């Protein structure tokens, strides 16, 4: 792979829905026409990020249908939408198995092999900070999630939910926004939780060439402490960072496995130091969108972090379409 690979994001569900509509029958990962991938290879892309491949949550979907703010958003982006159009968030993961509408989980390794033959690699999502609020672990292994001190729960009752009337569990969140109420927050201070996440990563490494890690900085000890300090029951943080442990264990078996971090808040260099191959360069996007040429040049000459490891983009699923922003 090139030192500076080109990454192409594909919304898995939309992509397959369009192919199925064109073909007049259901298309799954293994029946995607070769031409679809050839076109990307011929355009010079090295990696395909299949966004939203994992099984979504029925409870998260119901939450997505019930929130007035989200329904207003649907009206804006898809006038005339129906409930069948709402699949729920791809980042409230019920299981690290292929979402059934996309095919069978075994098709992922087959897709990776097809892409490899064309000189490309497959990138899949990994969401370390939280799982769907109805994930099986919520009921079978609740100790993996953040329960917090009772005083903290009284202080922030909207941060917690009680699955089926059981002990409270926190919703996933970052320190600057309200919680994601379709999720359950994992406890990064738990050795058992860390091992469980590493096992998921090792399984993904058998199906893909790398992972794009959602909100990767939320797994840092200091960030977890800052986010949850009001409610944490554990008196002290672990002696090792989760990412140092996780990346080391995965690379011991899969030395070339790629780790890409969605990262903000000036923590890109920290994550690179823990083993990430690439980290988001959101500052570059913001310079392009809101500043002038001199600011862009200044950013590109900054010593703040290794620019060769920056992921630069002009759009992704979190940002407006490029034509709407840059014309």
What are these regions (language model features)?
Residues 1-327:
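Active-site and adjacent substrate-binding regions of carbohydrate-active enzymes
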């Amino acid at each position: 792979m090139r030192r500076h690979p080109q990454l192409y994001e594909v919304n898995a569900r939309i992509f397959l829905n369009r192919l199925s509509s064109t073909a007049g029958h259901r298309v799954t990962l293994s029946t995607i026409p070769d031409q679809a991938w050839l076109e990307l290879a011929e355009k010079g892309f090295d990696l395909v990020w299949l966004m939203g491949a994992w099984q979504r949550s029925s409870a998260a979907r119901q939450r997505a249908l019930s929130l007035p703010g989200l329904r207003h958003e649907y009206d804006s982006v898809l006038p005339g939408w129906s409930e069948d159009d709402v699949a729920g968030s791809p980042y409230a993961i019920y299981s690290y198995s292929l979402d059934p509408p996309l095919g069978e989980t075994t098709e992922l390794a087959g897709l990776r092999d097809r892409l490899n033959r064309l000189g490309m690699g497959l990138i899949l999502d990994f969401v370390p900070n939280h799982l769907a609020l109805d994930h099986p672990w919520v009921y079978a292994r609740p100790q993996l999630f953040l329960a917090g001190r009772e005083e903290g729960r009284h202080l922030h009752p909207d941060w917690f939910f009680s699955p089926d009337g059981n002990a409270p569990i926190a919703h996933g969140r970052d320190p600057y926004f309200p919680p994601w109420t379709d999720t359950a927050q994992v406890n990064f201070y738990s050795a058992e939780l860390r091992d469980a996440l590493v096992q998921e990563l090792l399984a993904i490494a058998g199906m893909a060439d790398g992972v794009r890690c959602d909100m990767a900085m939320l797994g840092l000890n200091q960030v977890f402490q800052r986010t949850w300090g009001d409610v944490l029951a554990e008196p002290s943080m672990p002696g090792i960072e989760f990412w140092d442990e996780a990346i080391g264990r995965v690379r011991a078996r899969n030395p070339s496995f790629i780790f890409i971090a969605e990262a903000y808040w000036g923590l890109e260099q920290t994550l690179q130091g823990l083993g990430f191959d690439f980290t988001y360069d959101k500052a570059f996007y913001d310079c392009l969108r809101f500043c002038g040429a001199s600011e862009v040049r200044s950013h590109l000459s900054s010593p703040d972090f290794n620019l060769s490891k920056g992921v630069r983009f002009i759009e992704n699923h979190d940002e407006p379409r490029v034509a709407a922003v840059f014309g």
